[in-house]
Amino acid sequence: MNKIRLVVASLLLGAATGFAQKPFNASGTGNPIIPGYFADPTVKKFGDTYYMYATTDGSGAGFGPAQVWTSKDFVNWTLMPMNWPDSHWIWAPDVMKHTDGNYYYFIVSCMIHCGVSETPRGPWKNILGESEAVLVPDRFVTNAITLDGQTFVDDDGSVYLYWGTWGIYKGFGCGAGKLASDMKSFTETRLIPNTEATDFFEAPFVMKRKGIYYFMYSSGSCHDHTYRVQYATSDKPMGPYTYRGCILETNADGTIHGPGHHSVLKEGNEYYMVYHRHDNPHSNRGFHRQLCVDRMEFAEDGSIKSLIPTHDGIGALASSVVKSKNLALGAKVRASSFYDAGFRPEYAVDDNNGTLWRPRGMGQEWIEVDLGVAQQIQTIWTQFEYGTQFYQYLIETSVDGKHWSVFADKRNNRLAGSPMVDFGKVKARYVRLTFTGGQKNGFGGAVWNLKIFDGVEASAPQQWLGLTAADWNGREWQNNEGMLGGAFTLKEVRHAHSVSVDAMRWYWNRELHWSIVIRYSPRPKSIQLVGWFTGQVNGRVMKRGRVFHQERLRCIVPPNLWSLPISVTTIGNRKQRKRHTMRKRISCVCL
């Protein structure tokens, strides 16, 4: 990369536009989009929800569980686990919706697997049957190394798949194929050589605009500043393509470093490029990447203008789902320690997903927020450094900074997520978060953002999911569409007409058994399930026949919904159960 050329370009841009770039550590920057280390993003909008599929980064080798981030406004994102694949070697995922109504999930670990589901979050099953069955083995197309699979759906509904890495060698390039209607085979394949896609290294992405097919890809090394996005065009999805140039590269001051492996979101007439870049300060070897987004522009002839990467991002694409004020934003803060000047305590309250408070030690480090005056607090979001790992912590509040009360005790937590959401209702001036342990040794309690709200702010909207008796016959998974995501396992219990719905293993906790177990006989005609946290029967809590463990129930918002922090079951004699079952309908909802 020619640094002089970058500086000159930056100066010319500033002179021409008067644009002042916000520094990477400014409060409230829009980039990165998500708090955490993720790479190789694919962004899609299905219905009114945005989905971000990405490689889990930060481990040194792109190692992490299957997951997806969801958002209604493109600003507030919630991490949701997915059921497949079981391996943690999951790179460059992509999901598309087919004309058959199903969703197809393409994931890579030096070969491409394909899952199918009725929803964009799964539950997924390998389209070829066996969980480890491979759709595209390595070198399926000669001289195309299999990695980074991405789909493109043409106007006529035809589906194409593109893949490749290390395409810089002579005679190498990108593999491309047109999928058959069953999505299990190809009707046509081709190598798009690096003589057409100059400098092609990896991460192909194809889109169509006004009759032009754009073949975009990444060049250089993903470990350093040379990583960039280039493109070529054609009048056919399989090419041949004509090289057009570079459209995204490292900025002049290096704070947007190694941008690449992108996807494109079309929203109305606007196009947005979502890409990863290295963290700030830069970690060793570029394995701590973060996701960003910037607006694309096109010239009259259809060529893509050079994209100027920013720390501002694009902001919200819909009305914000968060209605309450973040009391912690810009508040005074102090901590037990901080690693160095690049990881100050103030970074935990700046609403910036690219700045991090990191304590010096690995023990019970703490951070304390001073709101100035006592205020009502109902919700606290904590966005820890690694959203796919669980953290154990204690949140306390105080009016005077001397006498403390417990707001949330998660010292036995086994649930991963981002944000971690804790509810309560207290008036306090001080909030203290203490890290007490975590999933992996050597990972301290670093925090991207600590957000304190005066209202009730769930990180995802309440959603209902109908489940009839027929749905669980022969079925193993049912998604949790509520705030905490994940999936339920469905299984028959010992009694022939009973049904058990158990939460997945990541909801287990030493202190509480986070699950819903419903046993009715005979089997109910229908049951509505969304989550594992609250329940109601016919719009009210069932209090007759000792249906639930009453001593374990507590009321939460909204009214008439009750938390079920342990397994619940029907209790009483057989006649009571039978009479009860015939006239009642069970509902569970996650807030």
Task: Set out the residue ranges of the language-model regions.
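Beta-rich carbohydrate-recognition and catalytic domains
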Residues: 21-198, 208-254, 269-270, 276-320, ...
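Conserved positions at the start
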Residues: 38-40, 90-92, 146-149, 201-204, ...
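Predominantly extracellular/luminal regions of secreted and cell-surface proteins
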Residues: 170-182, 318-351, 461-497
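Surface beta-strand/loop "capping" patches
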Residues: 197-198, 311-330, 363, 508, ...
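Catalytic nucleophile loop of clan PA
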Residues: 263-265
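Aromatic, loop-rich ligand-recognition surfaces of beta-strand-rich domains
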Residues: 350-462, 494-591
